[in-house]
Structures are given as C-alpha cells and as structure tokens.
Amino acid sequence: FLIKKNNAELISKIKNEVNGAIFPEENAKYSDPTFITALATRLNLTISIDNGIMHMVGLADNPMIVLFGPTDSEKFAPKYSNIKILDSKKIYNTEDISKISEKDVLDLL
C-alpha cells in the first residue's frame, strides 16, 4: 500500500484488516516522488483513488484502475492507455466514491 505516512489511522486499519499488508515507505530511509515512481515500475497493477500518489504511479504506465468521486475524471484521469476509470458520478449518479463496490473493481480485472 502506498499511503501518505500522516494517515496513521488508515494505515493501522489496513494492517488490522489485510493480512500481510506491506507499506514500502515505512522501511525506506526516504520518501519522495521519485521513490514512489520507481516502486511503481515494479507493480503489475495499481488500484487507486484520484490523488497525488496515483499520478506518480501513473508515470510507470502500468495497468491501473482509478476510482473517482467528487473530482472530474475527464479532467484529472491520467491519459495513459492502461488506465480504467470507475467514476461514481457516472455509475451511480453521486459524488460518493464509497458507492463504488468491490465488485465494480473486480469486474475490471
């Protein structure tokens, strides 16, 4: 999981719910955009929300599923060939990203 270190509560929740969850930045001596982008080149697939980390990972041009809620997917989605978009506004007519289900994501795999 690539999550900003200041999201301690979310990291703790994921560790409790996902057996064997890995957070590479916890063990790194540094963390910056080049580190995230370099790690991304090692990934087979990324599932992300619309955020800064997603844009850094997108530079690796690996397959990616990006979830959008209130932000405009037409404007902010990366323009790479391997990107699949799930936009809650288009699917469920709401800005509530939590309406996107696990099934929605799994259907794109």
Model-derived regions: residue spans:
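Donor-binding and catalytic core of enzymes assembling or modifying cell-surface/extracellular glycoconjugates
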Residues: 1-73
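Nucleotide-sugar donor-binding patch of glycosyltransferase catalytic domains
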Residues: 55-109
